[in-house]
Amino acid sequence: MMDIFPSKYINIGGDEVPKDRWNACPRCRAKMKELGLYDHDGHTAAQYLQNYVTARIQKFLNDHGRRIIGWEEILEGDLAEGATVMTWKGTGENVDSRLWNYDCIMSPRGYMYIDRYQSHEQDREPFSIGAYLPVENVYGYEPYDGVPEYGKKRILGVQANLWTEYVNTPEYLEYMLLPRLAALSEVQWVQEGHKDWERFRKALDHSAAIYDEMGLTYCKYAWGIVGLPENAQPARTPEELQKYLDSRN
């Protein structure tokens, strides 16, 4: 990994760790017993086992001049200084207060998971993971809301995530990104309390003209138009996907 990615940071993930499987695994249970891990202080033995693994990876990377980034599950147990934590579960006062002891990246699912539907008319939208996240909701995210002053100094930035389980064409990808990426940009660079939705909404007309000039596919729900154009519909079956791929060769 370090040969492939020369950056200072290496993201080790750390979320979606199947603790139930660890608890059912004889080797994992034996390792917990060997390490003297047990449920205490609001954490399970399996969570402390993950912390043990995280600490070993962190030391290895630190010894090689790198730093770890991980999702907020790496806070479970004891996390050494120097880690960077990505939070996805909530915002401000709703996150684990220990987050503010580390450099962090804000990526709350309610605002920054842009694999969600962009309109309430989901039957006319390309199939998605679910939920509803229009461009105005992305724009409405205030990273500092509910964050203590000392915590604001630890926020490195904001990240949006487009998980692509259902995204199988470039046009579909563009549709999910645009214009929500424009909203993300203002969340990132406009000073706290200075965003203005009405101004931004008018500016989207200019952005749309650029998208059109570049031949990009984008969501037009902000203009009252729902769904992908007919010539950019995503493949919904393996056969449709193969037909699409053949047409691009």
What are these language model-derived features?
Residues 67-83, 87-249:
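Flexible, acidic glycine-rich loops studded with aromatic residues
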Residues 1-83, 88-101:
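Active-site neighborhood of glycoside hydrolase catalytic domains
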